[in-house]
Amino acid sequence: MDFLWALETPQTATTMPLNVNFTNRNYDLDYDSVQPYFICDEEENFYHQQQQSELQPPAPSEDIWKKFELLPTPPLSPSRRSGLCSPSYVAVATSFSPREDDDGGGGNFSTADQLEMMTELLGGDMVNQSFICDPDDETFIKNIIIQDCMWSGFSAAAKLVSEKLASYQAARKDSTSLSPARGHSVCSTSSLYLQDLTAAASECIDPSVVFPYPLNDSSSPKSCTSSDSTAFSPSSDSLLSSESSPRASPEPLVLHEETPPTTSSDSEEEQEDEEEIDVVSVEKRQTPAKRSESGSSPSRGHSKPPHSPLVLKRCHVSTHQHNYAAPPSTRKDYPAAKRAKLDSGRVLKQISNNRKCSSPRSSDTEENDKRRTHNVLERQRRNELKRSFFALRDQIPELENNEKAPKVVILKKATAYILSIQADEHKLTSEKDLLRKRREQLKHKLEQLRNSGA
């Protein structure tokens, strides 16, 4: 048994680094080389709990990278080493230190609290730069885009940042009862654990290369003059700045879509969250009125007219029906007085037609009646034309028994037959004239014979 135990121990010793390397496959690139020497069971449990609590959402392409065994880190993330002299310490120290506008309030964070806070912040890759940068600075938005614009998405980054900042803002407001001296001492002790958190920010890619749209609207007045109380709520600031401009409908991007409520048991934090949500909703509700006031102000010359719904009106169209069977009417020239009367009658007819347009049902019925009468007249005209062709065909000796003779043949044969009849008529009239002359001559000769015999 001792021999078997001695054989099994080197196997476990050799397999331990492999397991450690396998667990660290999805961590940052700059820590893969040194992570197996510092990781322990507590660290593994910490990251496992962090993934269970959804503080760091997994990237959508994480399964693909596991399949191909690649690292899902686009640019280098900032270093996590702690130091003493870093510009990032100034931002965090000033954010948690008492200000002049606060009524003697200050931070009550001890050294252990600062360590716990930093470990939580260092746990999420997308919060490293966004929390430490100045909210009024452009790098506050750029750093989120640098780290997660291609992997975790904007909505996950905005949600995580807003949750972190809302929780620390509530903790800062709860700590306003302590003295400012203690706040300064705590901030001075916290400087030992904050350094180089933004040291690698200059090595990252410029977000303008990755993201073609403008990051923030520098022309909006509300985003530039943000108050200290809303300095830690970038989602509400972005919403208010996007709603402040009157023509903010084609806004290119709003990084923080909504402010999620914090998961805390304190009633004060819930009330503060409700107040923040109410401010955003009231601002959204008041934006149409502000837009209407800004559109009606004379200073803006390019205000849009109010959009009126399209009203379709059906008017009466006078259609003159021509009876083709009727003989052509001769045009008469009316005198000036009669012409004026006719013009006035036409105007009255147009007015009556315009009045009829107000009732669409009556106009529909009138149009249907006119269409029906037009169809009846057209049918009658075609029937009469067909009967006339049949009668003409019956008069022609060559086409008398041909029922399927086309109309063109009927017309040609009819013209030829008419010309022949006219020629016969001329011959007969000439013969008649000759016979009349002959009769006159015979009568005259008969009278001469009677006179001579008497």
UniProtKB/Swiss-Prot annotation:
Modification N6-acetyllysine, positions: K159, K164, K173, K290, K332, K338, K386
Keywords for this protein: Acetylation, Activator, Chromosome, Cytoplasm, DNA-binding, Glycoprotein, Isopeptide bond, Nucleus, Phosphoprotein, Proto-oncogene, Transcription, Transcription regulation, Ubl conjugation
bHLH domain span: 369-421
Residues carrying covalently attached carbohydrate according to the record: T73
Ranges in coiled-coil conformation: none
Positions bearing Phosphothreonine: T23, T73, T330
Biased composition (Basic and acidic residues): 281-293, 330-346
Comp. bias (Acidic residues): 266-278
Cited Pfam families: HLH, Myc-LZ, Myc_N
Effect of S77A: Does not affect interaction with TRIM6
Tissue-specific expression: Expressed in the intestinal epithelium (at protein level).
Domain notes: The 9aaTAD motif is a transactivation domain present in a large number of yeast and animal transcription factors.
Assembly, per entry: Efficient DNA binding requires dimerization with another bHLH protein. Binds DNA as a heterodimer with MAX. Interacts with TAF1C and SPAG9. Interacts with PARP10. Interacts with KDM5A and KDM5B. Interacts (when phosphorylated at Thr-73 and Ser-77) with FBXW7. Interacts with PIM2. Interacts with RIOX1. The heterodimer MYC:MAX interacts with ABI1; the interaction may enhance MYC:MAX transcriptional activity. Interacts with TRIM6. Interacts with NPM1; the binary complex is recruited to the promoter of MYC target genes and enhances their transcription.
PANTHER family: MYC PROTO-ONCOGENE
Protein name, UniProt field: Myc proto-oncogene protein
